Amino acid sequence: MGANEDQEMELEALRSIYEGDESFRELSPVSFQYRIGEDGDPKAFLIEISWTETYPQTPPVISMNAFFNNTISSAVKQSILAKLQEAVEVNLGTAMTYTLFEYAKDNKEQFMENHHPGSSTTPIANIISVETPSAAPSSKKKDKKEQLSKAQKRKLADKTDHKGELPRGWNWVDVVKHLSKSGSKDDE
C-alpha cells in the first residue's frame, strides 16, 4: 500500500472514531486538532497533528501553537512535544494519529505537572485593575442620548402619536377571537 492509501484509511478511521466528539476537529484531510481536557479545565491543552506527504513512513508535524495554548509556558509545551516525539519514534511506519491523541489523554496529568495555571492569570488581573481607574474619569462625562437614524425615527413616529405615546388600545385583545380560542362556559 502507498502512503496515500494508508492516509485515506486512517482518515476514514479517525472520522468514525471521533464522530460526535467535540474535542476533535478536522482542519483539513491531513491536519487534525484534539483538545486534551474538559472545557474550563485550567490544565487543558490543544494538540495539532499534520501529516506529511509520506506519512506514516515519516513522522507527522506536531504543534502546540494554537491560541488555546497561550496560557501554557513554552517549557511545558516543549516537554509535551518531546514526549510525543518519543511516541512517534516508537510508532513510525504505522497509523499513529489516534495513538498520539490517546497517549496525550492518558498522560495529561504527567504532561501538565509543571504547569501552574494560577500564575498565568495574575498578569491578566493586574492588567484589568490597571485599566479600571482610567475608565472612571470617562464615566464623569455626560452620557449621550442614543442617536437614531432617519428610518428609525420615521418608524417610531409611525407607531406613536405626535407626543411619542402609543395610541389608545394598541395592546387590546380582540374579544371575539379570544373567546373562540378559550371556548364557552358550557364546554366544561
From Swiss-Prot:
Pfam annotation, one family: RWD
Highest taxon, organism lineage: Eukaryota
Biased composition regions of type Basic and acidic residues, renumbered to the chain: 155-166
Region of interest (Disordered), residue spans: 132-167
Segments forming domain RWD: 9-111
PANTHER family the UniProt entry points to: RWD DOMAIN-CONTAINING PROTEIN 4 (PTHR21275:SF1)
Protein name as catalogued: RWD domain-containing protein 4
Lineage, uppermost ranks: Eukaryota, Metazoa, Chordata, Craniata, Vertebrata
Chain's gene name: Rwdd4
